[in-house]
């Protein structure tokens, strides 16, 4: 493998944050400097954590996942007051979801190791599975290349319900059939059978979406020391109840903190992305087997548009009696992570970084500092055949990342022709239109009854011109079919659906192409945290 870095333009909060703009950096409590990380360590040492309870739960959970010894040792290390975590999280996507989930894990593993060495303290990597999430449309699919098109393939649950990913049962046989259909679109390689068995072993041990995700991530990162936590696990939820009570008691201050911080963001010229109702409590409650966001109305906590109502005392009692009924939303999830773990750094994608900029005053409301927020590593893989296509088309490696591939294709095609087809036909259409306008005026003057026919005559002439243009383009494209297919392959591989590769492609494609140790070999590469995009030639 060969790794290169390129600067890819970013926008909004992310761009200004990475460029060191003081105004947006003031929305975060720590800058990304070594001194700031030392200050973070000092601040964490001033706080108390219920480490032993968390360790007991994580040992049981990761042992059930058959995690490696390095993971279990890292869990035990969390019991020591001088151990800290680098954390990231994601929904439990089928087959681990898009590549950026894998890249988040790589990011926390890399940063944890680097900070352990530079700060001289134990730092362990933790991945927070958003098991409470109930939006199945976010996790029930993957993308694949089929019939020269990128297509979304959805796993249709035969018994869908508005439950969390931790509680949504997965039909193993149906999912196995779905996975086999996906692998049929991959090239048959020496690794295919092993990868299918690898995935099936994880599936066989799973009852829910989170189970499948957790088993697969554990197997992919078997010897890395990665710790997994299911945010909706009932045993974890018991440990979180004191903080849920704090959120309920401070829900007005939490909402006010969010609104005030969003006003700061607006004044800086950014558009807030967290949308909440004015009376939101920022806690979900399971009601009638559905996850319902609570709101406050006239001193009562209500759900389902008032169909269910609770007093403060009733809600607290229910939390103590049935803690698993409660879960966080986008605002309180970061707070809960901060409550549970001694977080040295949080790693997030561009969207997460933007919405975390809206949470500073919310953190302060509950007595926390926002941890250092580190943008995750961004990575694109370039297979040898794609590198060859780029070379054959005389494109630079950075071109597909800095330009629209369709535009590159059009420019290349135009350069193969003496005169651009579009320009020539536009000129012809304009000249014909001018001539026909004069002709129609003449017809109307001589015989007004033929005016409508003259108008139809112009339409037919235009139709014939457009038909000629399409036929000419079709013939030209056929002439350069080999080269244009290279553009198609480049787009599928590097910018599928016009998006970054890591937002569309799934890791299983690369495991199938390069073997089960693919991710391990990726992690051997040196990565930097300067916001540049990493291009890895395979």
UniProtKB/Swiss-Prot annotation:
<dbReference type="Pfam" id="PF10079">
    <property type="entry name" value="Rossmann-like_BshC"/>
</dbReference>
<feature type="coiled-coil region">
    <location>
        <begin position="248"/>
        <end position="268"/>
    </location>
</feature>
<comment type="function">
    <text>Involved in bacillithiol (BSH) biosynthesis. May catalyze the last step of the pathway, the addition of cysteine to glucosamine malate (GlcN-Mal) to generate BSH.</text>
</comment>
<dbReference type="InterPro" id="IPR055398">
    <property type="entry name" value="Rossmann-like_BshC"/>
</dbReference>
<dbReference type="Pfam" id="PF24850">
    <property type="entry name" value="CC_BshC"/>
</dbReference>
<dbReference type="InterPro" id="IPR055399">
    <property type="entry name" value="CC_BshC"/>
</dbReference>
<comment type="similarity">
    <text>Belongs to the BshC family.</text>
</comment>
<protein>
    <recommendedName>
        <fullName>Putative cysteine ligase BshC</fullName>
        <ecNumber>6.-.-.-</ecNumber>
    </recommendedName>
</protein>
<dbReference type="InterPro" id="IPR011199">
    <property type="entry name" value="Bacillithiol_biosynth_BshC"/>
</dbReference>
<keyword id="KW-0175">Coiled coil</keyword>
<dbReference type="GO" id="GO:0016874">
    <property type="term" value="F:ligase activity"/>
</dbReference>
<keyword id="KW-0436">Ligase</keyword>
